[in-house]
């Protein structure tokens, strides 16, 4: 060994041994003094300040959107929006309203996005695919709680069309007709078997919990055909199911402003997420539930394949999830991750907004005795023998006052308040004298469309009569609870079906009487734009007592 290494080299190597290290480190070089470190930190700070200054100058004066009106602070930074949506819990929509009041029908609401408040332009922006391709705003996709890959969170127009195609048959009018008996059955179980069983007990019932349970069971039946009503049959209508969506909605603005949090949750165990933050844990548990349902669909597919090979009957009906895993989508579109996120979107979007509208409608019907009496009288023509004889959806849709009540409820509950930003990827958009560059996110909100005084006089009043008699083209144009165009709400027909059956059963002649308990307008009137509209966050819900 010594023959290969001279003494000086052996001494140097020995100096690396732990026992020798303390005496062989050289002294700290002079250039690493505290003064120099402070200067280095100052230089880094100066570079960062120059970068921020340059970014602000670009956004205010050089950006393609610099020509559009709006507050300078909104053009400079997205933190202006984040402040109102995170600190004030979904209040930016009201700031946008003030911007339009001050600056006009088109405003720049953040460094990258425009908002338009002009009812006549809606049909120009939200178009079908044969007119113009429409992409989704990338920042929205990144912030919608790990739904990337689902049809809802797909940016590309063409890819969205491919992903949505297998879903459309289930939620078409014809598809909902096939599901009608199931919805009618679950309606009877909720209203007759559960709610009316509380008659004379004095028990306070939260209708928002009951309706969330109902909508959850409906969409679960569609997706995986669960044999039992997991939520409706729960003693208190599975309040955790409601709380999961409520907490999730409250957290959405934070995730949209800081999408990196989603990636953190993605790799975090559900138990740890729950410990750190209740809403984070809710998302993790919801994801696990959707994964289980997707695996159930895959097991059904395996049983189907086995039964076909053995000439046995195929087990069960073809559920939506089973249809997805058995579809002719390319392999990349059938990955576990993407299908799991699709499942989360279908179950989540099929539950919360419809249930919220049911509670909203019940409140306004109950506080208006004339509306309640007129609705009950009209329902008598098809509900006299209920539940022994159930009306069809088509029969309910022929009742003009029932349809007017539903339309007015959807108008005032908005469907969603949030602006649905759309992107024209290759063509510029024209709005009055403005040319909007391709690739610019542009949004419009049902909150503005549904409150247009020219179209809907006395817009904040619940007036079903406005939908009777002559309905003007402007009313049809402005009525957008499910949006329009190539990306309109997939579950529109299902929502109408559920609303018809629930209201018919709740307010039919001879139904067990129920009254509001400790509930006022603040418990239903939307005041927070959390993607879905929500009333005051400390509300105790729509509570009733069956007399």
Swiss-Prot record:
Lineage, opening ranks: Eukaryota, Fungi, Dikarya, Ascomycota, Pezizomycotina
GO BP: secondary metabolite biosynthetic process; terpenoid biosynthetic process
The enzyme's E.C. designation: 1.-.-.-
Transmembrane segments: 42-62, 242-262, 345-365
Cofactor: heme
Annotated GO CC locations: membrane
Pathway annotation from the record: Secondary metabolite biosynthesis; terpenoid biosynthesis
Any matching Pfam family: p450
Residues holding heme: 489
Location in or out of the cell: Membrane
The encoding gene: oblB
Metal-binding in keyword set: yes
Family: Belongs to the cytochrome P450 family.
Coiled coil: none
Catalytic activity: ophiobolin F + 4 reduced [NADPH--hemoprotein reductase] + 4 O2 = ophiobolin C + 4 oxidized [NADPH--hemoprotein reductase] + 6 H2O + 4 H(+)
The keyword Transmembrane helix is annotated on this UniProt entry: yes
Name of this chain's protein: Cytochrome P450 monooxygenase oblB
Enzyme class: oxidoreductase
Known function: Cytochrome P450 monooxygenase; part of the gene cluster that mediates the biosynthesis of the sesterterpenes ophiobolins, fungal phytotoxins with potential anti-cancer activities. The first step of the pathway is performed by the sesterterpene synthase oblA that possesses both prenyl transferase and terpene cyclase activity, converting isopentenyl diphosphate and dimethylallyl diphosphate into geranylfarnesyl diphosphate (GFPP) and further converting GFPP into ophiobolin F, respectively. Other sesterterpenoids (C(25) terpenoids) are found as minor products of oblA.
Residues carrying sugar: 277
């Amino acid at each position: 060994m010594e023959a290969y290494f001279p003494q000086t080299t052996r001494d140097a190597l020995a100096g690396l041994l732990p026992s020798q290290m303390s005496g062989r480190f050289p002294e700290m070089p002079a250039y690493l003094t505290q003064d120099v470190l402070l200067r280095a930190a100052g230089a880094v700070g100066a570079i960062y300040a120059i970068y921020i200054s340059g970014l602000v100058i670009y956004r205010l004066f050089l950006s393609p959107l610099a020509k559009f009106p709006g507050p300078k602070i909104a053009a400079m930074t997205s933190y202006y929006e984040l402040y109102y949506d995170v600190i004030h819990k979904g209040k930016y929509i009201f700031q946008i309203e003030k911007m339009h009041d001050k600056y006009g029908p088109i405003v720049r609401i953040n460094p990258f996005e425009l908002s338009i408040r002009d009812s006549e332009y809606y049909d120009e922006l939200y178009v079908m695919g044969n007119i113009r391709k429409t992409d989704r705003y990338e920042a929205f996709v990144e912030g919608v709680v790990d739904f990337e890959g689902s049809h809802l969170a797909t940016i590309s127009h063409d890819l969205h069309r491919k992903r949505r195609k297998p879903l459309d048959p289930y939620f078409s009018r014809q598809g909902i007709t096939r599901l009608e008996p199931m919805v009618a059955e679950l309606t009877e179980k909720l209203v007759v078997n559960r709610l009316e069983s509380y008659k004379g007990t004095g028990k306070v019932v939260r209708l928002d919990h009951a309706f969330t349970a109902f909508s959850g069971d409906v969409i679960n039946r569609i997706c995986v055909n669960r044999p039992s009503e997991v939520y409706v049959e729960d003693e208190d209508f599975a309040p955790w199911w409601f709380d999961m969506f409520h907490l999730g909605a409250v957290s959405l603005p934070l995730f949209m402003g800081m999408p990196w949090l989603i990636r953190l949750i993605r790799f975090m165990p559900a138990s740890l997420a729950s410990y750190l933050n209740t809403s984070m844990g809710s998302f993790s548990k919801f994801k696990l539930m959707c994964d289980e349902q997707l695996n159930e669909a895959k097991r059904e597919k395996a049983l189907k394949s086995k039964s076909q090979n053995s000439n046995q009957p195929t087990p069960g009906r073809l559920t939506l999830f089973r249809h997805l895993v058995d579809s002719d989508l390319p392999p990349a579109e059938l990955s576990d991750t993407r299908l799991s996120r699709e499942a989360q979107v279908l179950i989540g979007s099929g539950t919360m907004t419809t249930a919220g509208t049911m509670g909203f409608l019940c409140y306004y019907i109950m506080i208006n005795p004339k509306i309640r009496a007129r609705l009950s009288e009209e329902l008598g023509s098809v509900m006299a023998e209920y539940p022994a004889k159930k009306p069809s959806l088509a029969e309910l849709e022929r009742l003009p006052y029932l349809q007017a009540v539903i339309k007015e409820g959807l108008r005032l509950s908005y469907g969603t308040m949030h602006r649905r930003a759309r992107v024209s990827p290759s063509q510029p958009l024209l709005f009055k004298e403005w040319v909007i560059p391709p690739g610019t996110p542009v949004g419009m909100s049902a909150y503005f469309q549904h409150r247009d005084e020219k179209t809907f006089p006395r817009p904040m009043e619940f007036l079903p009569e406005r939908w009777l008699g002559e309905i003007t083209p402007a009313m049809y144009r402005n009525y957008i609870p499910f949006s329009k165009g190539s990306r309109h709400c997939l579950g529109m027909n299902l929502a109408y079906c559920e609303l018809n059956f629930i209201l018919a059963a709740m307010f039919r002649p001879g139904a067990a009487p129920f009254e509001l308990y400790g509930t006022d307008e603040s418990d239903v009137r939307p005041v927070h734009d959390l993607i879905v509209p929500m009333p005051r966050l400390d509300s105790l819900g729509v509570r009733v007592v069956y007399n």
